[in-house]
Swiss-Prot record:
It is found in: Secreted. Disruption phenotype: RNAi-mediated knockdown results in decreased feeding capacity of the ticks. This is Kunitz-type serine protease inhibitor IrSPI. Glycans are attached at residue 49. Its main location: secreted. One of its GO terms (cellular component) is extracellular region. Induction: (Microbial infection) Induced in salivary gland, gut and ovary during infection with Bartonella henselae. Infection with Bartonella birtlesii or Escherichia coli does not affect expression. Serine protease inhibitor that modulates blood feeding of ticks on vertebrate species. Moderately inhibits porcine elastase. Slightly inhibits bovine chymotrypsin. Represses proliferation of murine CD4+ T-lymphocytes in response to mitogenic stimulus. Reduces secretion of several murine pro-inflammatory cytokines, such as CXCL10, CCL7, CCL4, CCL5, IL1B, IL13, IL18, IL6, IL9, IL5, TNF, IFNG, CCL11 and CSF2. Up-regulates murine IL2 secretion. Does not inhibit bovine trypsin, human thrombin and porcine kallikrein. (Microbial infection) Promotes Bartonella henselae infection in ticks. GO terms for biological process: envenomation resulting in negative regulation of voltage-gated potassium channel activity in another organism; immune system process. GO terms for molecular function: serine-type endopeptidase inhibitor activity. Residues 26-78 form the BPTI/Kunitz inhibitor domain. The lineage of its organism: Eukaryota, Metazoa, Ecdysozoa, Arthropoda, Chelicerata.
Length: 94
């Protein structure tokens, strides 16, 4: 029973850590894309290195590692900077 509980906790921790991006990935620059004529523009969210938080990016048509459909998704995938739950704000250094 104890071994089963340990295994469940271990796999839960691994799944949680694999479900989000590394801080380096979240701090990737957001690519500037040129949209094709008639392309559907949308608002996406990305982690902004200057403000240390997820922010909206209006008029995007591209995709990238640091682009998310919702702010909640951005915060969940990039829990760094002002979104950190550890009690300290990352200074952005790697």
């Amino acid at each position: 029973m104890k071994a089963t509980l340990v295994a469940i906790c271990f796999f839960a921790a691994v799944s949680y850590s694999m479900g989000r991006l590394t801080e380096t990935q979240c701090r990737f620059p957001v690519p500037v894309t040129s949209c094709a004529e008639g392309a559907k523009l949308r608002t996406v969210y990305s982690f902004n290195n200057n403000t240390n938080q997820c922010e909206p990016l209006k008029g995007s048509c591209g995709e990238g590692v640091n682009q998310f459909e919702t702010e909640d998704c951005c915060r969940r995938e990039c829990p760094y900077g002002k979104h950190s739950k550890v009690g300290k704000v990352s200074d952005g250094t790697f």
